[in-house]
Amino acid sequence: MHFNSSGPEPKENEPPSPLVSGIIDYNMPLTSTYLKQMKLRVMNSQEQDETSVSSEDFDMNDSAWMSADPHLASSLSPSQEERMRSPQNLHSQEDDDSSSESGSGNGSSTLNPSTSSSTQGDPAFPEMNGNGAAAPMDFTATAEDQPINLCEKLPPGTALGTPSYPSDGCGTDGLRSRVKYGVKNTPESPPYSSGSYDSIKTEVSGCPEDLTVGRAPAADDDDDDHDDHEDNDKMNDSEGMDPERLKAFNMFVRLFVDENLDRMVPISKQPKEKIQAIIESCSRQFPEFQERARKRIRTYLKSCRRMKKNGMEMTRPTPPHLTSAMAENILAAACESETRKAAKRMRLEIYQSSQEEPIALDKQHSRDSTAITHSTYSLPASAYSQDPVYVNGGLNYSYRGYGSLSSNLQPSASLQTGNHSNGPTDLSMKGGASTPTPPTPTPSSNSTSRTMPTAQLSPTEISAVRQLIAGYRESAAFLLRSADELENLILQQN
C-alpha cells in the first residue's frame, strides 16, 4: 500500500474517498492482517501531531505496509510502538479483530464502488501538508482512480495496468510480495457484462470457464463426427432388454439404410420422408427401441462416411459380434412382417382410390380385374424363390431379373382368370411405364369387347399401382440383401 505525504487520510468510521484507490494496492490479498494494518495506519496517523509528521515516516511506513510481513513492529518508529502498546490501542485492536472476522470492517467498504462514491457529499478530509490547515479536496478523479470491483476480472491494460513500483524505500520482503501478487498480463477470458451471481461465483472460485453452458445449441449435431463406434450400441444402455433383439434391430436399421438412403450423406441432408418411414418401420417391428431409431440411423451413416474416408470396403459383412443365429431369425421375421404390412397398406390405398373413382364395368370384367390384381400381389412370393442376381461377384443386387418374374407369373394369372383360356394375360410393362395393361382381347371375347367399353385406369390408380410396384421392388431387394448376409454368415461360421 503506497502512502505518500500528499495523500489525504480518511477518518476512522467513514468510508474512503475515490482518491484512496490511488493509495490502496489491490494486488494485496484481502486478509484480516491487511485490514488491521490498514486501520492501525489510519488511527496512528490521526493521533500523530500534524507538525511532527515528516516525509521520512511515510517513506519508512511505505515499505512496511507493502511487505505484508508479520514483522510490523520492527519497522515502526519508537513513538508508534508506544502507542501500539497502550491499552487504548490494544482495545481497538481487539475490536478490529472482531469487525474484520464478521465481514463488517471498514476495509470491506473499499471493495464496493457504490459506497465509496457516497462520500462525495461529506466534509473535506484533513490534508497532511504540515501547516495544519484543512484544504478542500479535489473529487474530480479519473477512471483510473475509481475503486475497482474485485469480484470481476480486469482485462490486461485497463484500470490497474502494468504495475510500476518505486525503487526507494522498499526492502526484499516488499519486492517478494509484489512479485507474488503482481498483475497477470496473460490474456484471459473477457469479463462478464452482467454482475450476476453465477458469473461472480465462477470468477471467484478460480475454475476454468465452461464454454458449453448457456451457449445456444448447434443447428443440427447430426453432422459432427463424434467418436461413436460403427455399431457400438452399449449393452449397458439396454438393461432389461433382449440383446438378441438389439442385434436384430441394428441389422434391421442397416438394411433399411442400405436400401433407401445414400450412406455418404448425413442424416440432416437425407430426405425427411425416407427417414421417417424407416423410423416408423423400426417402431412397428421393434417398439422397445423406437426412441433410439434415429440415433441408430445417424450412427450408421457416420460410420459409413468414416469408413469411406479411411478407404475401407463398404460392402463388408456384418461383424460377427453384432449378429447371431437367433438375431438373424428375428430379423427375417421382422422383414417378412414389414413386407406383409407394406403390401396390405398399398392394397388399402388402391382400394380407397378405386372407391373414390368407381369404373362402370360388368361383373365378369370386374372379376377378371380382381384376379389380375391378386396375381400382381403374388409378385413378392415368387420373388422370394428366385436366385439372387450378383453383379461383379459382389453382394449388390439389380432389378434386371424382374422382367422374367413377370413372365413367370403369366401361367398363374391365366389360371386365376379362367375366362381367357386361349392365352395368358399380358402383364408386360410397355414403354417403361410400370402399370399393368388391361387384358388383351381374344377371339372368344371379341363379342364382349364390342358391347363393353375397355377399362381405363385413372391417373390416381396408375400412381397407386406404381407405388405398389416400387414397394415390391424395394421389398424384393431388401430380402435379397438379407439372403446375401445370411449366406455370408454361414460361410463365416464354416
From Swiss-Prot:
Q: Where is the composition biased (Polar residues)?
A: 43-55, 410-425
Q: Which residues carry this modification: Phosphoserine?
A: 189, 354
In residue numbers, the region (Disordered) covers 1-24, 43-243, 410-459
Q: Where is the composition biased (Low complexity)?
A: 100-120, 443-454
Return the Acidic residues bias intervals.
219-228
For bias type Basic and acidic residues, the affected ranges are 229-243
**Alphabetical keyword list:** Phosphoprotein
Coiled-coil spans are: none
Task: Please name the InterPro entries in this protein's record.
Answer: HTH_NOL4, NOL4/NOL4L
Q: What is this protein called?
A: Nucleolar protein 4-like
Name its species.
Mus musculus (Mouse)
